[in-house]
Amino acid sequence: MIARIAGHQYRKGLHALERGDLDALLAQFSPDATLTFVGDTPLGADLSSATDVRAWFERFLRLLPDRRFEVQRYQVSGPPWKMQLAAHVVIRSSIDGEPYENQFAHFLTLRWGKVVDDLILEDTQRWAGACERLAAAGLVDASAAPMR
């Protein structure tokens, strides 16, 4: 039962991100949550403050304004005070009018329903190519340094 609730909350967070509702999304995060996006791209990050985590999601929204997520599978384990959620997700968007699709592995640690650690492993080669296209289209954030 707890796994189903966690899966529902996870999808609810992704839907908030699709809508660009960062307040709803970040309400699921603990104030001391960490976020790691592996890679040396504009979304690359190793963050540990609520302000920086919000700034990362703001950059994400600017880079992919019409994003859609499709959860392929997820697994939940552990008690409510140290729950682990792992998901395989496909992301779709468009870049300069052309379709963009990628996939990522998402690992969350939750404490009493709040995200305390967020780790994202995306196909960085595909994402780096997308950033080149975005930069060529004039999006400044697409050539920004990782957020460390």
Question: For each of these PLM feature ranges, what is it?
Answer:
Residues D23-L26, S30-W81:
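A solvent-exposed, acidic/Ser-Thr-rich amphipathic alpha-helical stretch
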